């Protein structure tokens, strides 16, 4: 079983669970050996795939979509570190999908800049700089400014810097 086939297997299993009658399920798929990958990778990918399968967009819907089928999945593992890592990655993917699914009259450059600033406040190891039209002109970003002329919204260039985690103290 190679990595691509494992991910495809996860997606197909989760798709079947989501469209079926079960509300909760347990999975041992993370225990399958995957060529060239360790068990931590399998657990992490399983968590990411499960979160993707459970995703429902309803940010701008009057009535949130009623969950159909699967709403909770237990993954058989003792590797809590890989589960947490998968959840963190899945959270980032979900946040990105939410932004991508928002209509353009809501998800404007200013809205994206506000989200970036919120991320910088939320995570101490993320820094943000937002350049406005004047700053972009000073830097000679004429191609970007040319594209922005087609919009009624003012351009914003967002620079997010991830500064990594702090090293663990040496004992």
What are these regions (language model features)?
Residues 1-171:
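Short amphipathic alpha-helical segment within the helicase RecA-like ATPase core
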């Amino acid at each position: 079983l190679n990595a691509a086939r494992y991910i495809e297997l996860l997606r197909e299993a989760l798709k079947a669970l989501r469209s079926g009658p079960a509300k909760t399920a347990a999975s041992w798929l993370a225990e399958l050996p995957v060529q060239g990958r360790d068990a931590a990778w399998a657990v992490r990918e399983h968590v990411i795939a499960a979160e993707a399968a459970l995703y429902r967009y309803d940010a701008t819907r009057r009535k949130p979509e009623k969950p159909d089928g699967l709403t909770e999945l237990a993954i058989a593992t003792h590797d809590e570190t890989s589960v947490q890592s998968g959840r963190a990655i899945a959270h980032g993917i979900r946040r990105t999908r939410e932004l991508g699914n928002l209509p353009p009259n809501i998800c404007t450059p200013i809205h994206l800049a506000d989200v970036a600033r919120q991320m910088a406040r939320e995570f101490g190891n993320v820094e943000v700089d937002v350049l406005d039209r004047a700053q972009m002109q000073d830097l000679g970003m004429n191609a970007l400014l040319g594209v922005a002329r087609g919009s009624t919204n003012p351009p914003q260039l967002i620079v997010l810097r991830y500064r990594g985690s702090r090293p663990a103290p040496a004992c």
